[in-house]
Amino acid sequence: MIKIRNLNQFYGGSHTLWDLDVDVPKGSRMCLMGRNGMGKTTMLKCLMGLIPTASGSISYDGGKELRGVAADKRAGMGIGYVPQGREIFSQLTVEENLRVGLEARGLKTAKKKELTDYVHSLFPVLKQMSQRRGGDLSGGQQQQLAIGRALTLEPKLLILDEPCEGIQPNIVADIGDLILRLNKDLGLTVLLVEQKLPFARRVASDFVILDKGRAVAKGAIGELTDEMVKQHLTV
């Protein structure tokens, strides 16, 4: 689904990604791991076209080169993205937040209703709170709204940057259940950054560890050893 080769990125005078090679197989649930400041979010932003890359290639869905494709065009290619901090529209209602994604696609009214109903089926609380402002929701509810909005794009690839950050444990469990369900039922490929090791072990099928902008370990999640955790993840 995603193939990154020899990717380099600079932030000011800092070399943040070094000849990075990462594969995200179609249908996988890939967890990008590493301590803070190691390049995980930077890699996701490169995937989404939010920051420039210096060299290398990013191919998607059978070989489509993403470098040079505008960020809004990448979303239209079937990539849903939920960034750190969720970035919902706090002054808009829940319904209006969902409508933003739907309107951008130019869909017919019946299709918009179908997708809204689908999101409500995944997150009943969003239907109950449809007229509440996004800023009035709890952190967990905002995360559900952000994921729901991304799903209105009907993505082939869903990218989640620390989906469990700052939210209550019961919603963390619900988000884990949802990732597994979407992957199993729809074949949705998921790429997530996650610091919580128990959540990663439960949800991911595969992992990549970044250390100072380099991929230093990768494999099936069952191959993530205690030694790797101690060397690359423990603070």
Q: What is the meaning of each model-derived region?
A:
Residues I2, L17-D19:
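Conserved structural motif at the start of ABC-family nucleotide-binding domains
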Residues M33-R35:
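The feature captures the beta-strand-to-loop junction immediately N-terminal to the Walker
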Residues M48:
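Helix-to-loop junction immediately C-terminal to a conserved catalytic motif
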Residues S57-A75, K108, I221-E223:
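ABC ATPase NBD Q-loop/coupling interface
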Residues L92-V100, S130:
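Short coil-to-helix segment of the ABC ATPase nucleotide-binding domain corresponding to the Q-loop/switch region
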Residues R133-L137:
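Conserved ABC ATPase signature
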Residues A150-L151:
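ABC ATPase C-loop
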Residues E154:
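Conserved catalytic motifs of ABC-family nucleotide-binding domains
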